C-alpha cells in the first residue's frame, strides 16, 4: 500500500523493526523512558526543547497505557536506567479512527516535522469518551507516517474502498444517501438510517459533479453482493471493536 494513504475505517497491520537503544528510566508511573533512536532534536525550535527521551506506556491495563504500540525487549519490568534494550512495534492489527494532514508540517521539537497524523486503536479497543477535561482522548494512539520512524503498513481491509467522501448514491430500496465515511451515511429523506443503505448501490455524483462511467461501474461492482451490515460484521471480526462514531 501507499504508506501515506490512510482513511478512517482502514484495518492495518503496523510494525516497526526493533532497534537498539538505552533505558533512561525504569518503570515509573506506568511508563518506561528510553533514548529515542529515530528522531533528531530540533535545536532551532522557539517553542520548546526536547531531550531525546520518549516515555512509553507499559501495558498493564490502565487507560493511559492501553493505546501504546511500542514494546521493549526485554520487557519494561526487567529494565533499569542504563540498560541496553531494543524498542519497536511487533506486527499489530489496528484500525484508523482519524487522519489529519498538516500543510505546513507541524511545529514539533523533533525532526523531521510531521506532515500527517494518523490515529489508531489496537485490536480489541473501541473508541470511547473520556470525561471533559481529561488528558486522555478515546480516539487512540497517534503516529506520524513519514516522520523518520520506519513503520511498515499492510492494509487488511478498507471498507467501501471504491467510495470517496461526499459521494451521493441511490440504494436498492430507493433511498438516496451521502457517504462521508464507512460509518457515516446520511439519508436525504431525513429518516433514521436504520440498517444503512441497501446494496447494490448506484453512484449518482462525486465531488458535487456527475460521476464518470468508470467510477459508477466500480461502485456497482463493489456492492453487487454482500451488504452494509455484512461489511460491519467483517470489519468487527478483524478489529474486535465497534465502528468509530
Predicted features along the sequence, with ranges:
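Short beta-strand-centered aromatic/proline hotspots
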Residues: 18-33, 91-110, 175-187
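Intrinsic-disorder/low-complexity loop/linker signature
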Residues: 20, 25-26, 31, 47-48, ...
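Short coil-to-beta transition motif at edge beta-strands of beta-rich domains
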Residues: 3-21, 76-95, 163-170
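Short linear motifs in intrinsically disordered
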Residues: 1-5, 27, 71-78, 100-111, ...
Amino acid at each position: 500500500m501507499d504508506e501515506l494513504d490512510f482513511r478512517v475505517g482502514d484495518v492495518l497491520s503496523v510494525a516497526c523493526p526493533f532497534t537498539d537503544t538505552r533505558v533512561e528510566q525504569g518503570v515509573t508511573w506506568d511508563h518506561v523512558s528510553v533514548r529515542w533512536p529515530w528522531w533528531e532534536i530540533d535545536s532551532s525550535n522557539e517553542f520548546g526543547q526536547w531531550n531525546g527521551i520518549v516515555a512509553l506506556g507499559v501495558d498493564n491495563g490502565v487507560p493511559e497505557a492501553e493505546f501504546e504500540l511500542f514494546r521493549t525487549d526485554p520487557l519494561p519490568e526487567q529494565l533499569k536506567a542504563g540498560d541496553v534494550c531494543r524498542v519497536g512495534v511487533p506486527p499489530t492489527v489496528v484500525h484508523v479512527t482519524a487522519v489529519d494532514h498538516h500543510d505546513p508540517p507541524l511545529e514539533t521539537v523533533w525532526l523531521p516535522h510531521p506532515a500527517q497524523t494518523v490515529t489508531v486503536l489496537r485490536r480489541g479497543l473501541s473508541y470511547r469518551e473520556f470525561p471533559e477535561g481529561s488528558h486522555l482522548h478515546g480516539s487512540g494512539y497517534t503516529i506520524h507516517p513519514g516522520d523518520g520512524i520506519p513503520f511498515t503498513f499492510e492494509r487488511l481491509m478498507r471498507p467501501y474502498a471504491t467510495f470517496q467522501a461526499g459521494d451521493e448514491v441511490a440504494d436498492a430500496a430507493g433511498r438516496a444517501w451521502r457517504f462521508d465515511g464507512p460509518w457515516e451515511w446520511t439519508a436525504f429523506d431525513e429518516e433514521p438510517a436504520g440498517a444503512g443503505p441497501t446494496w447494490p448501490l448506484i453512484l449518482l455524483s462525486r465531488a458535487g459533479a456527475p460521476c464518470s462511467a468508470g467510477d459508477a461501474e466500480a461502485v456497482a461492482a463493489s456492492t453487487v453482493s454482500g451488504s452494509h451490515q455484512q461489511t460491519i460484521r467483517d470489519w468487527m471480526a478483524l478489529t474486535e471493536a465497534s465502528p468509530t462514531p
